């Protein structure tokens, strides 16, 4: 969380933001009869929209722990963030990639952000910061806040820039009903776009 004393500073270049399906080593086709290891309602609800007969089983632990459980036979597949696998040099484990339109990511997914005491390292952070990424993540976090989505809530948002134009994808499973929506407009109106998308998802 951010506060005035310890603000967010530099936003990294965004790694691939989507989620992926990972199969056990040596397996090339997902067996729908085996459970899918998935942490979080956002992924669970969206995956079940794509595959209504899928059996979802909760999973905990870091990426390597989850992969060990997968390869031991406890799960038939996992749903993970592609960015995490790439940063661990495990891209070869990816079997299926889901686009942000198919499975809307969590706000800020794929981005590393610094946080430090106010006023410290300000010049360095300016050099490290990527303003367009910062705008996208702040817009995504704005939507999440408007929907009152904490880190465990079934809420997703992904902002994409095309020049000065922004496309904002949103997902909400609040209330148990999955809803998808998108809005488009000028990036200078990013806050208003987040508010418009929140209204669509709350209707």
Q: Where do the language-model regions lie?
A:
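A conserved helix-loop-strand patch within extracytoplasmic ligand-binding domains
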Residues: 1-53
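Small-molecule-sensing regulatory modules
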Residues: 44, 49-203
């Amino acid at each position: 969380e951010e506060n005035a004393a310890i603000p967010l500073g530099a936003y990294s270049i965004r790694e691939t933001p989507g989620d992926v399906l990972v199969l056990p080593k040596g397996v090339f086709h997902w067996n729908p009869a085996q459970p899918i290891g998935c942490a979080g309602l956002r992924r669970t609800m969206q995956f079940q929209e794509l595959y209504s007969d899928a059996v979802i089983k909760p999973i905990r632990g870091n990426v390597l722990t989850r992969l060990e459980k997968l390869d031991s036979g406890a799960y038939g597949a996992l749903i993970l963030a592609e960015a995490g696998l790439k940063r661990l040099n495990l891209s070869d484990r990816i079997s299926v990639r889901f686009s942000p339109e198919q499975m809307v990511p969590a706000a800020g997914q794929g981005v590393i952000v610094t946080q430090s005491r106010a006023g410290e390292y300000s010049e360095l952070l300016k050099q490290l910061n990527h303003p367009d990424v910062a705008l996208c993540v702040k817009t995504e976090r704005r939507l999440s806040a408007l929907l009152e989505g904490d880190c465990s809530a079934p809420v997703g948002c992904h902002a994409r820039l095309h020049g000065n134009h922004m496309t904002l994808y949103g997902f909400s499973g609040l209330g148990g009903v999955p809803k998808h929506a998108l809005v488009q407009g000028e990036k200078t109106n990013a806050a208003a776009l987040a508010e418009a998308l929140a209204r669509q998802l709350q209707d």
